[in-house]
Amino acid sequence: MDTVIDRDLHAASAQPWDLLVVGGGIYGAALALEAARRGLAALLLERGDFGGETTWNSLRIVHGGLRYLQSLDLARHRESVGERGWLLRHFPDLVEPLPCLMPLYSPPRGGRLRRPAVLRAALMVDALLSRDRTLPRSRVLGVEETAKLFPAVDREGLRGGALWHDAVVPDAHRLVVELLRWACRAGARALNYVEAAELRVEGGQVRGLRAVDRELGRSFELKAKAVASCAGPWVRRVARRFDRDVPGLFRPLLAFNVLLDREPLAPGAVAVASRQPDAQTYFLLPWKGKVLAGTAYAPITEELFHGRIPGEPLVEGFLRDLNAALPGFEARREQVLRVLWGRLPAAVEGSATPAPRPVIHDHGREGGPRGLVSVSGVKLTTARSIAEKVLGVFASSGALRLADRPAEVERPAPDPPLPLDELTRLAEEDWGAARDHLRGLVQRQSVLRLEDLLLRRTDWGIDPVRAESAARLCESLGWRASRARPAAAGGMG
């Protein structure tokens, strides 16, 4: 646990950088790691907390690209399988195999995709193209075996089930932090609550940017050869600020998942859809002893929102869809613990269909500042492979020179928090030891706010009921709420 995410603004502004990464979600963290491994001095800036927006609100499934076989996109299937394997190998403490079961029905329910013959062929192709996979082989099950694994399955017209394995990252927020710890070990730095305010350009070439510490409101300058914007839903806004609007970068749609206070339906994820031929498929998977269901999509409109969550009509409609897909499930609004929502890129303006492919926009090639690249990703799985492509764009434009091969930098030993029950017990037995554990976590992982601690360094605050007791425990152990504090204090008195 020797690797620290050190929020040292003075040190960051004192040296020149090869690459500034704007955005601290999964895409920014992966790019910071790959840049550092390729010999670049990389600094990541996140205007909020690491992994606090789209990444935190995701369904947490690491897909292997089975759906790409429907369109015969073999290259993307292979990429997804490879990246899923990379995550499983390098983060076995955070990424685990996930059995996925899709019930299969007689036509017309579910269209061609849910017919046994079609799924059997797709799974066979998937196996042939994934010979180096480490997950169990996929197979088509009979009716009784399907019902045994998924007792709540709708048996009307049931002809069996397709069973395959993907992966899941239950603590996606910790995956971001562990990527950043690895990047820091490789020589990068990462600063949260720092906003990229203004690009510095000389002679058409990126020279750095002006940044703002959002904790204290102070500006400082950063010198760099190149800037990559991985700002997620804000990538288009950053493009306007640094260059000009690029509509194709990000056309927003609403995406949300719902955490239900229900017992898990099966050991892994189940894929369900209503009896309408073109009904959307939803996944329901176990998460923290509850059921996480999604993903639902809707066009972005003002009337969708009441405050910061999707409006009640959308949530109620989603629950109706789930209940139609699973007669007898009877999910109710009062069982909703959290609505995890965010913005994803849409295929076209005003659409409820997600964009099918990521976008990498080299501003210099379009008459903008040379050394500025914007990235809009579409799935968690391929964040690292997209990072490699972004570095390739910088290299081909001459903005950056990369080492021929990534350096063999060993990932730091994981730095997990204690489970909340264990910390509570430790506080009762040895208050000082519990306080030291909390203080160390806060200082090593750049925790500035209590929300960051409860939701993005730990899972203590995911259940709203437990969140209150977790907050009281942290305050009893010395957490203080002052925002205007030195980074070294880390919120611990």
Label the model's feature ranges:
Residues M1-L19, E34-R38:
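Extreme N-terminal leader/targeting segments of oxidoreductases
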Residues R174, W182, D245-L254, L259-L292, ...:
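C-terminal catalytic lobe of FAD-dependent flavoproteins
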Residues R60-L149, Y282:
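Dinucleotide-binding Rossmann-like beta1-alpha1 core, especially the glycine-rich loop
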Residues N192-R207:
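A conserved short coil-to-beta-strand element within the FAD-binding core of flavoproteins
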Residues S229-R244:
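Flavin (primarily FAD) binding-site architecture
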Residues L129, A147-A186, G208-R210, A296-H306, ...:
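Helix-loop-beta segment of a Rossmann-like dinucleotide-binding subdomain
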Residues A36-N57:
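Glycine-rich FAD pyrophosphate-binding loop
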Residues Q15-W17, L216-A226:
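Core beta-strand elements of the Rossmann-like FAD/NAD(P) dinucleotide-binding domain
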